[in-house]
UniProtKB/Swiss-Prot annotation:
Quaternary state and interactors: Part of the 50S ribosomal subunit.
Pfam families the UniProt entry points to: Ribosomal_L6
Organism: Deinococcus geothermalis (strain DSM 11300 / CIP 105573 / AG-3a)
SUPFAM superfamilies associated with the record: Ribosomal protein L6 (SSF56053)
Keyword set, alphabetical order: Ribonucleoprotein, Ribosomal protein, RNA-binding, rRNA-binding
Keyword Acyltransferase: no
Record NCBIfam families: L6_bact
GO cellular component: cytosolic large ribosomal subunit
Name this protein carries in UniProt: Large ribosomal subunit protein uL6
GO biological process, one term: cytoplasmic translation
Length: 185
């Protein structure tokens, strides 16, 4: 049996869940989220916990078991706590600011880059060099954060650009002659 699939999912207070006709719905203080799932699997609620069970050990059921449990757990956590991904800007003059709901990045191009958030995602800029991407859908928050990072990926030689907080960038050495020593004459 799937190690992930057999783990129960705790349902926090204030979150209501419903699973029928192949759609799992979770409602909580942060909003409402629906996740489609394969109807061959069963999602049951017992003692404030959700259990995802599969009808057999067939390959397709085993493949869907852990996936479905994780998607359901992400939906429950999203509507109760939400998800946040933090990005940081490194580079001289690199900064971000909010213009209404949109994120405006000044990151070394001849023009500012404006990113409009999709429905369900919000931006926050606590510092000019830090961006928080927030929402209830884990997949959507991660995709938007990756799109923001893609605007100016970290440079391989200096590390300048947009990166996730805590991300380690493997820097290249650069030219061998740029060590500052005396060159040939």
């Amino acid at each position: 049996m799937s190690r992930i699939g057999r783990q129960p999912i705790a349902v926090p207070n204030g979150v209501t869940v419903n699973a029928q006709n192949g759609v799992f719905t979770a409602k909580g203080p942060k909003g409402e989220l629906s996740v489609p799932y394969n109807t061959a699997l069963n999602i049951t609620q017992e003692n404030g916990q959700l259990l995802v069970t599969r009808p057999s050990d067939r390959q397709e059921h085993r493949a869907l078991h852990g996936l479905t449990r994780t998607l359901v757990a992400n939906a429950v956590k999203g509507v109760s706590d939400g998800y946040t991904i933090n990005l940081e800007l490194r580079g001289v003059g690199y900064r971000a600011r909010l213009v209404g709901k949109n994120l405006e990045l000044t990151i070394g191009y001849s023009h500012p880059v404006v990113i409009e958030p999709p429905a369900g995602v919000t931006f926050a800029v606590p510092e000019p060099t830090r961006i928080d991407v927030m929402g209830i859908d884990k997949q959507l928050v991660g995709q938007v954060a990756a799109n923001v990072r893609k605007v100016r990926k970290p440079d391989a030689y200096h590390g300048k650009g947009v990166r996730f907080v805590g991300e380690q960038i493997a820097l290249k050495a650069g030219k061998a002659g740029a060590t500052g020593g005396k060159g040939k004459k």
